[in-house]
From Swiss-Prot:
Gene that specifies this protein: pdeC
A GO CC term attached to the entry: plasma membrane
Topology versus the membrane: Multi-pass membrane protein
Family annotation (Pfam families): CSS-motif, EAL
Entry keywords, A to Z: c-di-GMP, Cell inner membrane, Cell membrane, Hydrolase, Membrane, Transmembrane, Transmembrane helix
Top-level division of the source organism's lineage: Bacteria
Domain EAL positions: 268-520
Keyword Repressor: no
SUPFAM superfamilies associated with the record: EAL domain-like
Protein name, per record: Probable cyclic di-GMP phosphodiesterase PdeC
Compartment(s) where it occurs, according to its Swiss-Prot or TrEMBL record: Cell inner membrane
Length: 528
């Protein structure tokens, strides 16, 4: 599996996560939203139940206060009428009874001869408060009511009055709990004290049990608490309601993230960004192709050729990425990278081999200013390399602006660096421009060299270039030499310097230096 295929395979889970994350997040938010809403509703209902209980207790106190002001004979028709008139003004009081302790004597409706004695109260508080929960007495026969006694008067209350609240939730259940007697004194019809009892002590929490959600709220005024429950299905219903809004937002978020990811990926995988990363990670490397003096059969130097190893192992040559660097304004960065690496690779070697040189390729923009000269001077001084050991090549098509480039070339030459026109013959230079530029070397392009020993007429161009170079006193270097016949042809016409696979391919720096050390044992003209 290729590196790229592996990268794409590993990236697939990330892409899936990126697309699904906003949708999953929207589901989660919708659920939290629904849960919070149901929880708030439960706590609101519980608080309403407490408030309702507080109101009922308040009414019971008011009834007792009003009844205590009666000054006449008790359990007479007048007394009964007085009690009846009092309870008519209070919604949640069903009956009012006159009593002495737990001996109930008469109510607003009945006055038995001897009254009725009730079992001891469930709750007593000094000085005179008693509460009887779920008692079925002759005063309210057939119904289990709550009897709240203060002093001599007992308010009779329907247990449902304590906490009954209005709701659109048919599954809503509730109960009100006395924390002293540990008794539920009010329960909705469907509620079970056995179910509520283990949960009432979970203060200020919402819990899930047996398909229901439960919430409890404790009173800050009295020793009572309320618990409210609703079916878990209500949470699901709220979840679906919120999902109508949350899911489209999640899908939209997924689309936005996907588009953003595609944009970032496009930018990340763009040729410009790839080249930038290659420079930052020092992935570009230099190979060195020997330049041979075919008269002495010695290697006099090498051309530094920039290579970019691709992700799948292929090596890209400058023709593929230098135009990109020029277009994206990165060419100065490339040039500085090459110069730094040339001296890092061969600086020490050149310092100890004064008869060898390295030729560095430059772009047209490098000849628009003299910026590069100062950088080269600093490197030659740092490595103790002579200026004559560094030569520069620029392609012929770069010399379109002769007036602008001529003074820069002159500055290079005055600093001791020779300048060569690369790939001469395939561009637009004419004799006048060639004289004006005042370069040192002409390099014959490979496209002409490969036709030298064929019957094609293009070899005549090579002969013309050689004659032109001789007439101007320029050195010539033939590129792309691959056969001994080409070497002989060039030698006969006075070409002294060649490079190509016939002599050696471009090599990494360490291999090149080893090759140079073993050079005396080779016969160059045999292409070893």
């Amino acid at each position: 599996m290729s590196h790229r295929a592996r990268h794409q395979l590993l990236a697939l889970p990330g892409i899936i996560f990126l697309v699904l994350f906003p949708i999953i997040l929207s589901l989660w938010i919708a659920f939290l939203w629904a849960k919070s809403e149901v929880n708030n509703q439960l706590r609101t209902f519980a608080q309403l139940a407490l408030d309702k209980s507080e109101l009922v207790i308040r009414q019971a106190d008011l009834v007792s206060d009003a009844a205590e002001r009666y000054q006449g004979q008790v359990c007479t028709p007048a007394h009964q009428k007085r009690m009846l008139n009092i309870i008519r003004g209070y919604l949640y009081i069903n009956e009012l009874i006159y009593a002495r302790d737990n001996h109930f004597l008469c109510s607003s409706l009945i006055a038995p001869v001897n009254g009725y004695t009730i079992a001891p109260a469930d709750y007593k508080r000094e000085p005179n408060v008693s509460i009887y929960y779920y008692r079925d007495t002759p005063f309210f026969s057939g119904y289990k009511m709550t009897y709240m006694q203060r002093g001599n008067y007992v308010a009779v209350i329907n247990p449902l009055f304590w906490s009954e609240v209005m709701s659109d939730d048919p599954t809503l259940q509730w109960g009100v709990y006395d924390t002293v007697t540990k008794t539920f004194f009010s329960l909705s019809k469907e509620a079970s004290a056995a179910t509520f009892s283990p949960l009432i002590h979970l203060k200020d929490l919402t819990v899930q049990r047996n398909g229901y959600l439960y919430a409890t709220v404790y009173s800050t005024k009295r020793p009572i608490a309320a618990i409210v429950a609703t079916s878990y299905q209500r949470l699901i219903t709220h979840f679906y309601n919120h999902l109508i809004f949350a899911l489209p937002a999640g899908i939209l978020g997924s689309l936005v993230l996907l588009l953003l990811w595609l944009r970032i990926r496009q930018n990340y995988l763009s040729p410009k960004r790839k080249l930038q990363r290659a420079l930052e990670k020092h992935q570009l490397c230099l190979y060195y192709q020997p330049i041979i003096d075919i008269k002495t059969e010695k290697c006099i130097g090498a051309e530094a050729l920039l290579r970019w190893p691709g992700e799948q192992g292929q090596i890209m040559n400058p023709a593929e990425f230098i135009p990109l660097a020029e277009k994206e304004g990165m060419i100065e960065q490339i040039t500085d990278y090459v110069i730094d690496n040339v001296f890092r690779d061969l600086g020490d070697y050149l310092a100890t081999h004064a008869d060898r040189y390295v030729s560095i390729n430059l772009s047209a923009s490098d000849f628009h200013t003299s910026r590069l000269i100062a950088r080269i001077n600093q490197k030659t001084e740092q490595y103790a390399v002579r200026p004559q050991q560094i030569k520069f090549e620029v392609t012929e098509h770069a010399f379109l602006d002769v007036d602008k480039m001529t003074p820069i070339i002159l500055a290079f030459r005055q600093a001791g660096y020779e300048v060569a026109i690369d790939d001469f013959g395939i561009g637009y230079s004419n004799l006048h421009n060639l004289k004006s530029l005042n370069v040192d070397i002409l390099k014959i392009d490979k496209s002409f060299v490969e036709t030298l020993t064929t019957h094609k007429t293009s070899h005549l161009i090579a002969e013309h270039i050689i004659e032109l170079a001789h007439s101007l006193g320029l050195k010539t270097i033939a590129e792309g030499v691959e056969t001994e016949e080409q070497v002989n042809w060039l030698r006969k016409r006075g070409v002294r310097y060649c490079q190509g696979w016939f002599f050696a391919k471009a090599m990494p720096p360490q291999v090149f230096m080893q090759w140079m050390e073993q050079l005396p044992a080779r016969e160059l003209t045999r292409g070893q």
